[in-house]
Amino acid sequence: MSKIIGIDLGTTNSCVTVLEGDEPKVIQNPEGSRTTPSVVAFKNGETQVGEVAKRQAITNPNTVQSIKRHMGTDYKVDIEGKSYTPQEISAMILQNLKNTAESYLGEKVDKAVITVPAYFNDAERQATKDAGKIAGLEVERIINEPTAAALAYGLDKTDKDEKVLVFDLGGGTFDVSILELGDGVFEVLSTAGDNKLGGDDFDQVIIDYLVAEFKKENGVDLSQDKMALQRLKDAAEKAKKDLSGVSQTQISLPFISAGENGPLHLEVNLTRSKFEELSDSLIRRTMEPTRQAMKDAGLTNSDIDEVILVGGSTRIPAVQEAVKKEIGKEPNKGVNPDEVVAMGAAIQGGVITGDVKDVVLLDVTPLSLGIEILGGRMNTLIERNTTIPTSKSQIYSTAVDNQPSVDVHVLQGERPMAADNKTLGRFQLTDIPPAERGKPQIEVTFDIDKNGIVNVTAKDLGTNKEQRITIQSSSSLSDEEIDRMVKDAEVNAEADKKRREEVDLRNEADSLVFQVEKTLTDLGENIGEEDKKSAEEKKDALKTALEGQDIEDIKSKKEELEKVIQELSAKVYEQAAQQQQQAQGANAGQNNDSTVEDAEFNEVKDDDKK
């Protein structure tokens, strides 16, 4: 079976891994980094992903960041006259990670395990799966991030029985899960979270503070300047990271704006205590889901054996202190919070291929599932934190006499009223025979698969007529749309490859022109006039070709110049070798001169020696 790669598709950064032997290995990207920024940029028809996209975000308005926050919604990104869904943008990141894995493994990769926040709903999970498909990946499993982290942490501890709390605060989402580990079984007891809370929000409180300080001092509102905002975002992210290691940091942004008297500069000294004050409400927001997860699992603090911190934002000292205070236990810092989730995904890939044995993963559904019933109430069929895969059926009936059809309104959430929960989908069961209200028996069945994706069936037990749907939210893509996007991704990948090759060719040709000019200058009178003229002509021909758009012409002119310069170099070396031989011959002639000079010797007698 071919390799299954593990991917942590993060809000801020993403990571790709593979199982080597029985150990998960993080694959470095071409820049040598173990994580890749989840940033996509569009420039002159070319798509850029990762560090190169992030670097030019300040000057390029066509840069997309934190797209994960929009997964499962009908949000669109309009770039250069074209609309992109979150699935398409995410697919570009996944395709980049796929290419990184293929370069490392030296073989085609088409299968992956992708992680999602435990609190992702059905629409968000389906969107992630669609993104994988667009990127040319068969998503073998969608796995919850805290579960993946526990898998990586507990793989070598299968002989121990432990209850583990995983506190996962990433770039854009927050989850807390409680798992029981023992005898190779990883069972999720409960999960809770907030999909709109993460490192981006910690950056934002710093940005808001800097904007307020600058406005107070200079009377200029930087929040209205897109370029200034991007510089502030980069500075805020850096300051946040710095304050995890030092007690204060200097934020310096020269020429951030301009006033009546000339350029304005931002200089702010941010202390850790001030940052903790600014972010206090965010940290407190993480505590309620933590308490909820503990309550749902039926555990007290003394029952928890280990606390694992996941996600880059858990490096913030105030976050670590809050977790320690809440659970009463020092968090385990033996795992890399940026990589552990992806490593767990690779292990799950190994479980699927059979390379990892004696490991069973029992995950849960994060939110309750049900349907709307009379009075606009939600009737729950599957409670949150139910182990998946699972199936549950319930009998319903009609609300009025001779009702010909029933409308099944599928919901996800914890509120008692249907309107307050998320609609996953609607469908109708029709052609119900005329009967008094309450007489027909309609069996509604919910199935949740191993990826947490929902299928719903409604069946009239009187006629055995059945209607079945896989939940498609308003943001989900049809098979036709996915197929079109897959083709677009393939075409764009080929176009991007051609553009890269063209850029490389132009750079090489430009470099060759420079080298030839330098070589001709250095050689001066050491080359013949005819050779020099030929090299000059070929060089000028290549320079002219570089001004045009004919790639084949550039390629052929480059090859012609390379040939001339090689011949020229060979002649120069030949001349140098001949000159060296002549010089050596002259030296040898001097050493073999036939003139013999007489020398005088004094005889030393033995007595003189004594």
UniProtKB/Swiss-Prot annotation:
Pfam families: HSP70 (PF00012). The modification Phosphothreonine is found at T173. Disulfide bonds: none annotated. Keywords: ATP-binding, Chaperone, Nucleotide-binding, Phosphoprotein, Stress response. InterPro entries: ATPase_NBD, Chaperone_DnaK, Heat_shock_70_CS, HSP70_C_sf, HSP70_peptide-bd_sf, Hsp_70_fam. It comes from the Bacteria. Induction: By stress conditions e.g. heat shock. Residues 578-610 are annotated as: Disordered. GO terms for molecular function: ATP binding; ATP-dependent protein folding chaperone; unfolded protein binding. Residues 578-592 have a biased composition (Low complexity). Acts as a chaperone. Belongs to the heat shock protein 70 family. This is Chaperone protein DnaK. It comes from Staphylococcus aureus. The lineage of its organism: Bacteria, Bacillati, Bacillota, Bacilli, Bacillales. The gene is dnaK.
